[in-house]
């Protein structure tokens, strides 16, 4: 075995753990013919940690939004930075656009409905992913759920438990050859480390937990995993072209950026993004 290949096999698992980079490596199609060289190659797909999966981004405005759109954001504050570090992601918060310039979210103040303007003001970067087959009735049901639990508390206990879970779950990325193994591994760790609250007993939510429950209540679950296991980054990775830790029930579509954020602006300045 030549040295480059040996080094690659030796350091790849360590690299994946330290970088928390989830990878899917698919075997070649056994039914492909020998002349089908492209089908015979291994397909390697890396998890995208940035807010966009391609090199270029699309800037949008409020009229481009639809009820039920997911608003992913980050800020320049210490809390946002800490969440992004532990989740190895570019996002720290997720909310739902309800229409009529209203946004439903769970923050330290609890579950609340605020204006889109306020949500944008508190964010450095804000981009939108969409559930492509969401019906108007399901969007209405999401709004009804948000109004029903409005002013509920914030799930601080869930957040405290989530911090060590975000660290230990990175071990599940060490086997890039099995998507099923990764999902079973993460689910197993979640069952062992995170508390489980009965549906009727829930009195508080954190942001991604609220979003996951809202879609489930509307009859359009984003994932069948328990809502208390899901982080903003997990929802972001359920988009088309990405690699998700939990199996998505539907793949989210990138709509665009309402606010590019300081890092994307800097990337544009030096020519890294368009």
Curated annotation (Swiss-Prot):
Lipid-modified sites (S-diacylglycerol cysteine): 21
Coiled-coil segments on the chain, per record: none
Catalytic residue list: 207, 257
Entry membrane topology: Lipid-anchor
Keywords, alphabetical: Cell inner membrane, Cell membrane, Hydrolase, Lipoprotein, Membrane, Palmitate, Protease, Signal, Thiol protease
EC number: 3.4.-.-
A Pfam family recorded for this sequence: Peptidase_C92
Protein name: Probable lipoprotein peptidase YaeF
């Amino acid at each position: 075995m030549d040295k480059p290949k040996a080094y690659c096999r030796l350091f790849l698992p360590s690299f994946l753990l330290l970088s928390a980079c989830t990878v899917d490596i698919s075997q070649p199609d056994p039914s492909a013919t020998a002349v089908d060289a492209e089908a015979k190659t291994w397909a390697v797909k890396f998890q995208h940690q940035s807010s966009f999966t391609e090199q270029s981004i699309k800037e949008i405005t409020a009229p481009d939004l639809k009820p039920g759109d997911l608003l992913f954001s980050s800020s320049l504050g210490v809390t946002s930075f800490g969440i992004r570090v532990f989740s190895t992601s570019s996002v720290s918060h997720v909310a739902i656009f309800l229409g009529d310039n209203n946004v439903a979210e769970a923050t330290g103040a609890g579950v609340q409905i605020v204006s889109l303007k306020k949500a944008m003001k508190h964010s450095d970067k804000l981009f939108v992913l969409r559930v492509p087959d969401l019906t108007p009735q399901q969007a209405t049901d999401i709004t009804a759920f948000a109004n029903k639990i409005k002013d509920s508390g914030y799930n601080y206990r869930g957040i405290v438990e989530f911090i060590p879970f975000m660290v230990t779950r990175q071990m599940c990325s060490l086997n890039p050859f099995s998507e099923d193994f990764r999902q079973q591994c993460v689910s197993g760790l979640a069952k062992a480390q995170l508390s489980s609250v009965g549906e009727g007993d829930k009195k508080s939510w954190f942001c991604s937990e609220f979003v996951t429950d809202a879609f489930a209540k509307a009859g359009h679950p984003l994932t069948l995993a328990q809502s208390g296991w899901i982080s903003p980054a997990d929802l972001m990775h359920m988009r088309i072209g990405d690699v998700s830790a939990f199996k998505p029930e539907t793949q989210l579509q990138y709509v665009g950026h309402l606010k590019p954020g300081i890092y994307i602006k800097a990337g544009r300045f030096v020519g890294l993004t368009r």
